[in-house]
């Protein structure tokens, strides 16, 4: 920051220092800690290896459900979903369809109940840029932001009026990437580096896609290739003098039979239709988004709306006996435990075990896009995420365990200056 009397700003009850040195926070989609360790051990990610060994590297928790939207918004708001309101990629909106309700994507800023710290920093005078892989996040992350905000998915159509920057393919020097590719995330990193090289920025947020993580386990050739690419761009940002904080929105695990490769799925709507009658209950899968080739809308977290007068306790008890189920809670208990907005969560929250996913009806899931055995997320087993920095942390940590939405507080308030 230059020529500014302000040195701090606030957002959602948390105080932050305006960056005295350029600062970037990176959310690596689906990045469980083991991906970083494996790439470092293989010798393909020397910069990451240095951070893991000699800077500040922690294991923390993401928010539950361990999906993209609720965690990215928690990170950029600095608070859990009960405050900002985004509790899934997809939910049952009781106010939609003229009050009759409808299942909708949770991509519209109208669903946000809190402002982002990015917008607050920009309002306080910081030059801010946000780059996301998937366009579904762009409007949420960029809500009320005066600055640069674009997605790699639609980089070729970015305009000054809408995105604060144009001619991105020329600037970055890469072709428009496919949404189903590792190159989509590389474009995010490459664009971040080019902005750092060509603009006077104070704060950046980079958010990737988990295309590689859905297909490849830690230590695989494909995963290590991805992290080697990421390592080069992070090292360049470090060379340019940027403070770096890296976290993830969630981890990732195999969700298939190790012998057959078939997904391990509990089709909840089929189960409840047998128990209660056809379509009496409604199963919502908050992992649902337009990118079905990643996961086939199969994750380890679901919510259930029961018919009026339904016996919640009895259904919870019955669901708890199903093979592959880890946890079943009623709405008040789940929302208190996971800090979720009660009015956007069903009567029941259900979470499956590490290698099991939850579906709706079998015939409603198009799995033709799954070219490799299913890997997915959403449950408690994908809650652990990294928080790593290229400078040492000064002072006491803000929470124990750390949460991924502590990363801006750590990066702006507690990194040791160089």
Give a label for each model feature.
Residues 351-413:
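Low-complexity, glycine/alanine/valine/leucine- and proline-rich hydrophobic stretches
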Residues 20-36, 50-51, 75, 121, ...:
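Beta-strand elements within well-structured catalytic alpha/beta cores of enzymes
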Residues 3-4, 76-217, 223, 294, ...:
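His/Asp/Glu-rich, glycine-adjacent segments
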Residues 36-83:
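Short, structured active-site-proximal loop/turn typified by the sulfatase FGly-forming signature C/S-X-P-X-R
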Residues 1-56:
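Active-site-proximal N-terminal segment of extracellular/periplasmic enzymes that hydrolyze or transfer
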Residues 28, 66-67, 91, 95-108, ...:
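Secreted, luminal/periplasmic, and some membrane-associated catalytic domains
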Residues 30-33, 65-66, 81, 135-138, ...:
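Short, solvent-exposed loop/turn segments at secondary-structure junctions
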Residues 57, 127, 243:
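Residue-level detector of anion-binding/catalytic polar loops
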